[in-house]
Amino acid sequence: MTIYVVKAKPKEDLRADLRQELSSGKISSLRPFGEELHHGLENARMFEGYAYWVEEDYCSPPLAMERRSVLDRYFDEITVEQVESDEEGWNRIKDRPMLWKRYTFISPYSCIIYGI
């Protein structure tokens, strides 16, 4: 197993579709990598037009299954940098803004979503 910080340029015209796939649980249901990819994408950070997240992977080349199933559809210019641990990877990107805006609930029956 290897841990990577992933850097990828989102295809902006498909960003809402990716958000929908995350929200529906479609990505997390993919086996064997879905839960890890879902967690990474939900917590991804943005900087200078690129998304960054941490991914644990067993494939060679890295992210082969993830790219084939999800990433190549929604991102361009995908690169990886190996890190020693999950914690090290997230610490490197923690100060960047989140890729996704968070929900603000205003009542038990409604919420405001501040963009994707």
Give residue spans per PLM region:
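Short S/T/G/P-rich N-terminal loop/turn motif that feeds into the first structured element of a domain
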Residues: 1-69, 89-116
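Conserved short beta-strand edge segments in small beta-sheet-based binding/regulatory domains
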Residues: 76-90
